[in-house]
Amino acid sequence: MSRQSISLRFPLLLLLLSPSPVFSADPGAPAPVNPCCYYPCQHQGICVRFGLDRYQCDCTRTGYSGPNCTIPEIWTWLRTTLRPSPSFIHFLLTHGRWLWDFVNATFIRDTLMRLVLTVRSNLIPSPPTYNIAHDYISWESFSNVSYYTRILPSVPRDCPTPMDTKGKKQLPDAEFLSRRFLLRRKFIPDPQSTNLMFAFFAQHFTHQFFKTSGKMGPGFTKALGHGVDLGHIYGDNLERQYQLRLFKDGKLKYQMLNGEVYPPSVEEAPVLMHYPRGIPPQSQMAVGQEVFGLLPGLMLYATIWLREHNRVCDLLKAEHPTWGDEQLFQTARLILIGETIKIVIEEYVQQLSGYFLQLKFDPELLFGAQFQYRNRIAMEFNQLYHWHPLMPDSFRVGPQDYSYEQFLFNTSMLVDYGVEALVDAFSRQPAGRIGGGRNIDHHILHVAVDVIKESRVLRLQPFNEYRKRFGMKPYTSFQELTGEKEMAAELEELYGDIDALEFYPGLLLEKCHPNSIFGESMIEMGAPFSLKGLLGNPICSPEYWKASTFGGEVGFNLVKTATLKKLVCLNTKTCPYVSFHVPDPRQEDRPGVERPPTEL
């Protein structure tokens, strides 16, 4: 046989042979499950997939070893054995007032405050780790501040169920879930006596760093400062800032109405503000955050901070007559950042916590500790902070109740009533309880629906995984979560497994601590984000925290002695009742609070 005929027949013989089993594939065989869908790595170990069905846990510096990071080192075992549970710590901090009165008057307060700050802040990774596009360490996650960071990587896309390997193949409808478990039946006031002054402060304060980009998507932010930079007062970019500035003596633009200072109109400061069509530019107030025209309570705070900025500029000008406009403006901004952080820690967070330990803003407490003065806002923090149960059924100002339809985009209420009247009214009206479910007014329920939908786009891990990440034990049943049977049974029917419960519903449906505004998870997850963001601000660093940064001792003292009462009463003609909690009924008939001294 010739060599040529053999070469021609050989391919034909190959076609007649059965295929090699190496290349065969059974179309009916199930695809291997991504092993990281089981969340095998415990105690902050990192799951790395190898091949199709293998994984390895990176337990570096977790204090644990073993295939799944479950074997504690001796010091880790000792620390976890001796560490009390979060619920026990909360009980200690909210009972025994006589003991805490003693602690607050001694050096023990500073020691405990330092411990609180370091333990809480250490739970937040710095530098940031992941984002919506990268579930692994990358330079992009570190350097691109357009992203929100994230604490846990997203649920892998190839998992058998939306949340991992547990629960049902399809998550419950977000609107049905919200109406069934989050919609208010009857207003439930916060047992800690929190008021609307607090609720509006929360909205006003957080809108400087929660600014999700509608154009880029839910994993992106327009607030590139990632913290307390007062972009909601000065604008989040230089162009907007320049439109709002007077460029004289460091001050911001303003207008005089009824003999009082208010933000300028959009006609005077041409910046984008979101108002309904038909409202003329001269009736729109221009401030740093474009959405603050939505609620009179937000524009109230915008007005107060505008007055405070210009007041501080006058004080600095008197101290430093040679300073130019730019230095006066920039120094006043730093002072207001300091005042904000002081009020947030010592009054706002104090009210939220319900602790008898008096919280203290003193950056020097951390000067001897290992601490990074930078912050990146996490998408989980943004999700967590949707506290719409705070909002009431209606808004009472003076003798009149305003419905949502009358209150939203009400451009005349602030000027008609004046700052003092609104502060007094909002300080006296109770806010709603956040936790426990079924306390969001129907007018704003759509926000909760959108939050749940957004969390699915972000592919947040289950609620229990976040509890483990923040040092809490995962819930073993829906009844343990809610503390009752009815909602628990319905949630079981919808989700199928407690380990498939979503992040935001878990936070809002968790049973509250006794006489508390919300449950354990909101405190244990929210506090680390808050304290790391506040104390991670550059003004709290050793390089910045000195009198010269704030224009000398006068400016430094403004920061060190700031209170909500001073913020309001030094910028109004009379001093109304102002607080983050409703007044004690026993004090209702007492004379008004004395006006604080005009200078510190």
Swiss-Prot record:
The reply on keyword Lipid biosynthesis is yes
Active site (UniProt):
207, 385
Q: What class of enzyme is it?
A: oxidoreductase
Q: Where in the cell is it found?
A: Endoplasmic reticulum membrane; Microsome membrane
Check the UniProt entry and state the signal peptide residues, or none. 1-24
Name the UniProt key words of this record, in alphabetical order: Dioxygenase, Disulfide bond, EGF-like domain, Endoplasmic reticulum, Fatty acid biosynthesis, Fatty acid metabolism, Glycoprotein, Heme, Iron, Lipid biosynthesis, Lipid metabolism, Membrane, Metal-binding, Microsome, Oxidoreductase, Peroxidase, Prostaglandin biosynthesis, Prostaglandin metabolism, Signal, Transmembrane, Transmembrane helix
What note does UniProt attach to the cofactor annotation?
Answer: Binds 1 heme b (iron(II)-protoporphyrin IX) group per subunit.
Main location class: endoplasmic reticulum
Cystine links in this protein are: 36-47, 37-159, 41-57, 59-69, 569-575
Give the catalysed reaction(s), semicolon-separated: (5Z,8Z,11Z,14Z)-eicosatetraenoate + AH2 + 2 O2 = prostaglandin H2 + A + H2O; (5Z,8Z,11Z,14Z)-eicosatetraenoate + 2 O2 = prostaglandin G2; prostaglandin G2 + AH2 = prostaglandin H2 + A + H2O; (9Z,12Z)-octadecadienoate + AH2 + O2 = (9R)-hydroxy-(10E,12Z)-octadecadienoate + A + H2O
Record membrane topology:
Multi-pass membrane protein
Show which residues form the site (Aspirin-acetylated serine).
Answer: 530
Which GO MF terms does the UniProt record name?
A: heme binding; metal ion binding; oxidoreductase activity, acting on single donors with incorporation of molecular oxygen, incorporation of two atoms of oxygen; peroxidase activity; prostaglandin-endoperoxide synthase activity; protein homodimerization activity
Query: Could you tell me which CDD domains the record lists for this protein?
Result: EGF_CA, prostaglandin_endoperoxide_synthase
Which pathway is this protein engaged in? Lipid metabolism; prostaglandin biosynthesis
* Chain positions carrying an annotated carbohydrate: 68, 144, 410
Q: Which PANTHER family match?
A: PROSTAGLANDIN G/H SYNTHASE, PROSTAGLANDIN G_H SYNTHASE 1
This chain's protein is named: Prostaglandin G/H synthase 1
Question: What organism, scientifically named, is this protein from?
Answer: Ovis aries (Sheep)
